């Protein structure tokens, strides 16, 4: 009995020493830490918005952007904001998920789908809860419906394009990885900025969207890391019993 006990513990220790297990543990710990920070930051932002303390900041930033924006940016900003609409994101999501399944990246496909759908659902709920009206500081010739806080475009940008960037960065190596990361981050920021340029969101709306999506994304990643850990423990136990 003592021998069997020692063998089972040795098997678990070997599993814990495996690189994948350590990576999962690191991701889980990092996920919990980032989640805690994002929750705190989002709560602080909500408090500032609800109390009206962000009103002056929001107005100042929007008016500054409007007064310092050249007309030639209108076209690029409209294109950037179009990339955040569901009628563009959904087809791109379908293509990406199908492509990942075809190359055998099934878990990545699932994560991308859950990240995008969950972030979108979270945004809809938060918009309904806070019911913040959209800014009407200037007429940019562009209209948007529904509530303002948080920005759905910012959330979708991180939930879809951000998740896609993380997946590709994990799969790629060398310069290709950094190129994907730089382009992905630039696209997310560009979509968020386009909402300010067009005057349909306050800066705090966009910031809240950027925070809401990572909260869901990190939660999904932490859940995946925990699942890997549990699966590894079960596999180690199964190997022990099979002896």
Please provide the spans of the model-predicted regions.
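Alpha-helical membrane-inserting segments
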Residues: 38, 42, 46, 122, ...
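Membrane-interface loops
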Residues: 50, 56, 92-93, 97-179
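Membrane-embedded catalytic cores of phosphoryl/pyrophosphoryl-handling enzymes
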Residues: 137-243
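Residue-level signal for helical boundary/lining positions with a hydrophobic bias
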Residues: 80-81, 127, 149, 201
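C-terminal ends of transmembrane alpha-helices
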Residues: 43-44, 124-134, 190-201
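Hydrophobic alpha-helical transmembrane segments
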Residues: 26-30, 87-90, 109-114, 178-186, ...
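N-terminal transmembrane-helix/juxtamembrane module of multi-pass inner/ER membrane proteins
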Residues: 1-88, 128-142
């Amino acid at each position: 009995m003592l021998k069997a006990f020692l063998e089972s513990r040795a098997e678990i220790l070997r599993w814990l020493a495996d690189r994948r297990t350590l990576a999962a543990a690191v991701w889980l710990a990092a996920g919990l830490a980032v989640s805690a920070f994002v929750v705190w930051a989002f709560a602080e932002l909500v408090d500032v918005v609800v109390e009206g303390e962000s009103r002056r900041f929001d107005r100042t930033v929007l008016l500054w952007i409007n007064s310092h924006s050249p007309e030639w940016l209108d076209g690029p900003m409209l294109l950037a904001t179009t990339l955040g609409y569901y009628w563009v994101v959904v087809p791109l999501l379908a293509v990406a998920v199908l492509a990942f399944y075809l190359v055998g990246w099934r878990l990545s496909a699932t994560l991308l789908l859950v990240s995008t759908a969950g972030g979108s659902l979270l945004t809809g709920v938060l918009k309904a809860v806070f019911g913040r009206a959209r800014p009407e500081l200037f007429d940019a010739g562009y209209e948007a419906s529904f509530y303002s806080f948080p920005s759905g475009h910012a959330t979708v940008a991180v939930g879809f394009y951000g998740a896609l960037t993380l997946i590709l960065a994990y799969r790629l190596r060398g310069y290709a990885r950094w190129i994907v990361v730089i382009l992905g981050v630039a696209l997310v920021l560009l979509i968020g900025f386009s909402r300010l340029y067009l005057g349909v969101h306050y800066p705090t709306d966009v910031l809240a969207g950027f925070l809401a999506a990572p909260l869901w994304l990190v939660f999904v990643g932490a859940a995946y890391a925990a699942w890997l850990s549990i699966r590894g423990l079960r596999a180690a136990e199964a190997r022990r019993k099979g002896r």
